Amino acid sequence: MGLEEQLRLLPDRPGCYLFKDASGRIIYVGKARNLKNRVRQYFQSSRNLTAKVLAMVGQIVEIEHIVTDTETEALVLESNLIKKHKPKYNIRLRDDKHYPYLRLTLTEQWPRLVVARSMKKDGSRYFGPYTSSQAMWETMKLARRLFPLRTCNDPSRYPRGCLQYHIGRCLGPCLPDFDRHREYAEAVRDLQAFLEGRTQEVLERLRARMEQAAERLEFERAAELRDQIRAIEKVTEKQKIIAHTMVDLDVIAYARLYDEAGVQVFFVRQGKLVGRDQFLMSGADEMTGGEILAAFIQQHYSQTDFVPKEILVSEDLPDADVIAEWLSAKRGSRVALRCPKRGEKRALVEMVAQNAQEAMTERRQQRELELAATEGVLRELQAYLDLPRLPHRIECFDVSHVQGAEVVASMVVFEGGRPKKSDYRRFKMKVDQNNDFANMAEAVGRRFRRGLAERAAQVEGRVRDLEEGRVAEGGAEYGGKFADFPDLLIIDGGKGQLSYARAVMRELGVDHIPTFGLAKENELLCTEDRPDWIELPRGSQALFLLQRIRDEAHRFAITYHRKLHRRASTHSRLDDVPGIGPKRKKALLQHFGSLKAIREASVEEVAQVPGITLELAERVKEALGGPMR
């Protein structure tokens, strides 16, 4: 079906649209109040489209759409689809999956505060993400000092109380005669409020409890509460007052750097600045400031539980009313989303914007220093090895096995002196398991055969683009990771491995790529063009870079080899039976206890296991042997 026909079939309804290229990959996800009108705008006139959007439109061959009941639902769906598919042309939060959270385990009998690497829908309360692990651990340390919740995984292991209990940092739910259930529940509630920045609320509750304890003549308990109040007051005294009303709000501003945007968020709770975070957004080139902030708000607040009553932004947002409606639904009460133009709040926004600009300036300077240092190392390496061009892309191959078993090879890639892990590849050897030289040749051959095939696909894609009137740039999308050839190829090994690798490269017509062997024993390099070994100066940055690349290839190969070895060590004859997957295998072993018991059972007895038909039972018995009846 052609694009014109696909456009004609779009409904006049709210929803999300997904643009796909010729390979079926989703390259952009968007939302719309009216799908037909919004999507048609991309194809009606190119005058108002940026170069980036034009390039994207030139690659679209299929349009998929999902209808929703409201525009707010479309906004939520768009955020989820972007996170799932990571489309090339959408602006996205970078590396959010690496940011840690603090997790309050509310579903456990005795909740505790722990570190989590991702959010799950498990009934826990998550705080974060924390872009600084140091800030996260400082918050954890403070919370554990102020609120005496358990820190152990299994309270039953400490019937006499753990160390934290004996030093007054835990109420001791592990004790058999523990009777402070109410106090523990109050500590959990206070910790949650404290981490949300509602310290004044916590202090008011603690003061009320202290007075009640004193009235009941529980002076020891009153003293504990007094000390807790003083500790919290000491912490909050250090927090800067930036609003003269007891208000909870987030203040968000951004600054640009190349195709990135740095978004700065200041967290104000009850009028005091309790923290700030810096986030990076990729794909921000040609996006307006409002579009950057809107994308950030959607993605950031979809990952966090707490939404403040008010959010201030440095620029007006597109679809601000829809975003505010979504935030309000998430919070459970009205959220004000504002771009202040004057007054105290405008000054606050400008202060955050200034911080964002300073952070990105620092990032630019750091990047320039790193680039200058890296280019110097690469030029040094180019001179030592007499390379025709700067080795921007370096690939390294390593083979790993134990006595010829589970032979694997790895290919690691460094670009600009840094690992490019998205281009790493692993190969399970298929030919000669006991010949290191042949294994290296197989890995190198498979890499370049795939690369040549992808380059051919690129050419075909460009020709098809030109014939169909699409943007020629789109042809590049038909290739894969192997289509980029290295400026320098390193073989982990000596002249034998190098010779076999070069032979297969000549056969494929890629022997123009400079290739060197790097011996482990003495860190010497060899190449076909020189009879003698090449020794780089000890302590040189060029040698250090090659060692780092070689060690990374070895690590990557060893990791894969161990994975295969573990899989082989847990392999059973049941794994070879068609129709028996992990669940049915588990059911059989749980029912009979061992393979021997299954072998001795009859077909009818095996068929009594849930999920096992009579036909499957016969297959199992044929594979394992033993009596059929």
Curated annotation (Swiss-Prot):
Would the keyword Lipoprotein turn up in this protein's UniProt record?
A: no
A Gene Ontology biological process in which this protein takes part is:
SOS response
Single GO molecular-function term?
A: excinuclease ABC activity
The alphabetized UniProt keywords are: Cytoplasm, DNA damage, DNA excision, DNA repair, Excision nuclease, SOS response
Compartments, as annotated in UniProt: Cytoplasm
Name all GIY-YIG domain ranges. 12-91
State if Acetylation is listed as a keyword: no
A Pfam family annotated for this chain is GIY-YIG
Cross-referenced SMART domains: GIYc, HhH1
Function in brief? The UvrABC repair system catalyzes the recognition and processing of DNA lesions. UvrC both incises the 5' and 3' sides of the lesion. The N-terminal half is responsible for the 3' incision and the C-terminal half is responsible for the 5' incision.
**Assigned protein family:** Belongs to the UvrC family.
Self-association state and partner proteins as the record states: Interacts with UvrB in an incision complex.
Name of the protein: UvrABC system protein C
Q: Recite the lineage of the species.
A: Bacteria, Bacillati, Bacillota, Clostridia, Eubacteriales
The coding gene here is uvrC
